[in-house]
Amino acid sequence: MGNLKSVGQEPGPPCGLGLGLGFGLCGKQGPASPAPEPSWAPAPATPQAPDHSPAPSSPTLTRPPEGPKFPRVKNWELGSITYDTLCAQSQQDGPCTPRRCLGSLVLPRKLQTRPSQGPPPAEQLLSQARDFINQYYSSIKRSGSQAHEERLQEVEAEVASTGTYHLRESELVFGAKQAWRNAPRCVGRIQWGKLQVFDARDCSSAQEMFTYICNHIKYATNRGNLRLSAITVFPQRTPGRGDFRIWNTQLVRYAGYRQQDGSVRGDPANVEITELCIQHGWSPGNGRFDVLPLLLQAPDEAPELFVLPPELVLEVPLEHPTLEWFAALGLRWYALPAVSNMLLEIGGLEFPAAPFSGWYMSTEIGTRNLCDPHRYNILEDVAVCMDLDTRTTSSMWKDKAAVEINLAVLHSFQPPKVTIVDHHAATVSFMKHLENEQKARGGCPADWAWIVPPISGSLTPVFHQEMVNYVLSPAFRYQPDPWKGSAAKGAGITRKKTFKEVANAVKISASLMGTLMAKRVKATILYASETGRAQSYAQQLGRLFRKAFDPRVLCMDEYDVVSLEHEALVLVVTSTFGNGDPPENGESFAAALMEMSGPYNSSPRPEQHRSYKIRFNSVSCSDPLVSSWRRKRKESSNTDSAGALGTLRFCVFGLGSRAYPHFCAFARAVDTRLEELGGERLGQLGQGGELRGQGEGFRGWGEGASRNAASCETFCVGEEAKAAAQDIFSPKRSWKRQRYRLSTQAEGLQLLPGLIHVHRRKMFQATVLSVENLQSSKSTRATILVRLDTAGQEGLQYQPGDHISPHPPPRSSHRPGQGGPRVAPFSERPLMPRTPPPGGPPPSWVRDPRLPPCTLRQALTFFLDITSPPSPRLLRLLSTLAEEPSEQQELETLSQDPRRYEEWKWFRCPTLLEVLEQFPSVALPAPLLLTQLPLLQPRYYSVSSAPSAHPGEVHLTVAVLALDTSRLCSPLHPAEVVKSGGVWGDKGGLTEGVLARAPSFRLPPDPYVPCILVGPGTGIAPFRGFWQERLHDIESKGLQRAAPTLVFGCRCSQLDHLYRDEVQDAQERGVFGRVLTAFSREPDSPKTYVQDILRTELAAEVHRVLCLERGHMFVCGDVTMATSVLQTVPRILATEGGMELDEAGDVIGVLRDQQRYHEDIFGLTLRTQEVTSRIRTQSFSLQERHLRGAVPWAFDPPGPDTPGP
């Protein structure tokens, strides 16, 4: 953005990257035309962007049809012609008249904004307000919506009752960005979308103003790596009250001391403000580069003097790369240009104090500030040192000296890595901005006299570009100096302050800086979850950031994605559902995020038009589309266009299962998409998978996010965030005996309300009707059919293909409290943990809301997970409770050595009880169990019935797996478990459950669309509901439907051929056309899997159904099978359809986009050892990469957040 130049004391047209913001509406023209051409013409139907192809010097104009006349704008270098239609929106006349052009005036009097003597007419204010509100709602694509109409009515009512109105924060941000976008004199507007807006409208005193300004300077300077642009907006002008004003023209300026001989030491442009500072108590030095203090004025009060802390002002000594004597000149300049005396107008509201900053264009320092005769005027001194002949202008000594001074400026800013841009790069970026604006708005206001830099005029592309100058609103406007005329109200000279008073003011400001900054830096934490785990983590994150920010925690479906453009900090915690899809409450957010446009993805390639689900399932670092725009972003600079989310800082944590092919796909996609849209990532993506310590991963990621240098230093709250992270995530905070106590409760546990309380989801109760083993009695394994009676509850109304998450009470052969481990004695009275409130006195105990009142046995049975291996964090807590030193040392080692922990966990798969048996000296107090054990997580199963065939019932197909943890998790004979009903209890028992919709796994509504169903093992579960529904339609309604093909797979026809009789009966009654079964362990037969059946017997049908008949394919089963099928189908399509394999892969993408290739994948399988061994290998690989710094956080959670049959 650059030196947003104010001109109150600087006559002449200063140039550069500044918001010089003049409004001479008839600016200088470019080179003379070789032949007269009309400068005004009827506008074409659609504004045309500049054509950058070479053209003759005198192009032939094709006259558009008659219509409204707009200025024709020509580029004399390229010969391209456009029409500026945006100028029709200008509502203010310029200073020029038919007989005179005032375009070269620096400060046209007509365009200055002076304080009015009374409130503006209500109708005038309403007209401007309506126009702005319309602009805002059009920008967010909500024009004409109910919210738009309600906001207009709200503004009208406020103006009618108070004479003014107030902007919402999002409107203020939009208005400030538009004001910069509309500034005709600024050459750096291509970054207008990245303006960081600090809302200081709650400021009430000059002291608070100074604190906000210090924060602004600290943020914008950023240790030399200057922020793109920032503005702090103080309270608006209010009728009957004085204004907030900053008397200085810029926040950082050098003093100018008038000498007795009339000369000036320092910067002559600042003599007047220097004298005012001295009158208000400043004790000046006498140097050429003394930083001026600030004069700040609150309404109806005298201005107050504030000295900027020296460490806040970054200065750059100037030296030349080849001229060694240049450094001896003692020249220097400050790094941050920040204009502070201009007025911001938005929708008729005026903000007289709105300092804004950017970075310098080199010519602003090297040519204007140092070489102008009315400034430092060093040109001749440098020329003499260069031995140039200054006696004649034909020696070009001025040009030679000016170039070397500019070269010195650019060179000096490079070693300390202070942001600066040369005038060639700046003007090229402005041409790109003109092109962007012509496409987006039909034009761009520009003042040619200010856009063309002060040197290299015709060597820059802007010199050859005609421009149209006009005024749009919102806008930055000039205003009279506050000590002149009527603006000087309350500006009397205050007594001279002592040095001690000034020093105390600086000290107080420094102490308030972080506090006030934290109050105004908002953080938005978004979550999307199916089980509530991501929500729980988001709430923990909210508690962490509450001490340093102003956070709000929202579910994605409660958040308006439009607000992303105005956010400063967003943290996302989300799970991944199904096949890499967003959870249900993240669907709308995902779709809206994909619809937003970014600066690096404007290519019209067909990949851009794919649906968000395809992008989310394919987005990765290896995606060529992602790699392309990421490369462009790395090559971009401050002169390139900003994205829609240019001011956003973000960080993402994902939950999922590493057993799935699209592990954390939604989180990865959100992370990638936010960066693609221009956001700045504050930390690497954190990932938590099903089979590793999710809590540890999240804590590490949360601490990293809060302590991250970019996150904290950006918002000036580093120490507060670090302290908060230590307080929230410290193991010492997690458990202290004195912080917890148990109290007995009169009420007993009601299980259903208790589960709803714990899982924060609506749940329903059902009765177990029967539990039937579907496998042969000779089988060493078991699969059961569970029938549940729902009693017709509305919350359990389902469709075939949906999922349900039951909560059967877990059975264990070793219950706590029955000998063995040292666990606190079980009380059969309901207990409630209590803890002191934050900041409250120790006697003031409050209920811990984690669990409902229940006995310890009930908590361990229904709510807490005692079967998963304890996390390193829990082992660390156990080490503090071990009485035997050797056991304490071993537990500490396991908790701190990731590789030792993984070896121990994967070899033993120990439950909590087995850990206590291994370390018998650990004595567990009951409060620790109730407050520190992880919650028992539900698992989702595909519904195996159709409501039309079994009203009031839900059927589930469940594979029962028993594990011997002392023998590397090998399956054991589960017959005893099945005979006793397994974990489901006996007939008539109660179970609680949650219904989850699966709208993407449903039979097509057209009964004549052909389908292929692929489901080995328990993957047949949802298909049972499909054939029951089809059978009911055939027999009860007489509907004839296309008969799908079923491909089933099992080990042996005599042992585990699930539902064989039902399938055969359904085929005989016309439900299935073909049924094929793959046997992987059939005696005297080769191993055959479902993908082999597809390849050898159904290849032609697969191609015909998917490519020719627009049919559907459904795949349900474990992740290994689903991956194999997904690899097989493209090969079939390539072979049968005569296409390349890449093309066939694209076809699968299209099928998914059209929801014709459906997957229902689950992670836990009967091949437990195979899958877990593979994931274990991945885990160790990730650990090694983490130790090398390649993967910051990649941990797996102990509980699933994805569904499965």
UniProtKB/Swiss-Prot annotation:
Q: How is its activity regulated?
A: Stimulated by calcium/calmodulin. Inhibited by NOSIP and NOSTRIN.
A GO molecular-function term, please? FMN binding
Where, by residue number, does (6R)-L-erythro-5,6,7,8-tetrahydrobiopterin bind? Answer: S104, R368, A449, W450, F463
- Region (Interaction with NOSIP) residue ranges read 100-489
For region Disordered, the annotated ranges are 1-20, 26-73, 796-850
EC annotation from Swiss-Prot or TrEMBL: 1.14.13.39
Q: Where does heme b bind?
A: C186, Y478
Q: How is the cofactor bound?
A: Binds 1 FAD.
Principal location listed in the UniProt entry = membrane
- Report residues binding L-arginine: Q250, W359, Y360, E364, N369
PTM annotation (Phosphoserine): residues: S116, S618, S636, S641, S1179, S1181
Binding, NADP(+)? R781, T1018, R1051, S1080, R1081, K1087, Y1089, Q1091
Spell out the InterPro entries in the cross-references. CysJ-like_FAD-binding, FAD-bd_FR_type, Flavdoxin-like, Flavodoxin/NO_synth, Flavoprot_Pyr_Nucl_cyt_Rdtase, Flavoprotein-like_sf, FNR_nucleotide-bd, NADPH_Cyt_P450_Rdtase_alpha
**Where, by residue number, does Zn(2+) bind?**
C96, C101
For activity, the cofactor(s) needed are: heme b; FAD; FMN; (6R)-L-erythro-5,6,7,8-tetrahydrobiopterin
- Respond yes or no to whether keyword Lyase is given for this record: no
Keywords for the protein's UniProt record, in alphabetical order? Calcium, Calmodulin-binding, Cell membrane, Cytoplasm, Cytoskeleton, FAD, Flavoprotein, FMN, Golgi apparatus, Heme, Iron, Membrane, Metal-binding, NADP, Oxidoreductase, Phosphoprotein, Zinc
Q: Which GO terms describe its biological process?
A: nitric oxide biosynthetic process
Q: Which residues bind FMN?
A: S529, E530, T531, R533, S575, T576, S657, C664, E690, Q694
A GO cellular-component term linked to this record? cytoskeleton
Question: SUPFAM superfamilies, alphabetically?
Answer: Ferredoxin reductase-like, C-terminal NADP-linked domain, Flavoproteins, Nitric oxide (NO) synthase oxygenase domain, Riboflavin synthase domain-like
Q: Describe the protein's quaternary organization and the partners it interacts with.
A: Homodimer. Interacts with NOSIP and NOSTRIN. Interacts with HSP90AB1. Forms a complex with ASL, ASS1 and SLC7A1; the complex regulates cell-autonomous L-arginine synthesis and citrulline recycling while channeling extracellular L-arginine to nitric oxide synthesis pathway.
Q: Give the family, as the similarity comment puts it.
A: Belongs to the NOS family.
Q: What does this protein do?
A: Produces nitric oxide (NO) which is implicated in vascular smooth muscle relaxation through a cGMP-mediated signal transduction pathway. NO mediates vascular endothelial growth factor (VEGF)-induced angiogenesis in coronary vessels and promotes blood clotting through the activation of platelets.
**Name this protein carries in UniProt:** Nitric oxide synthase 3
- Write the gene name: NOS3
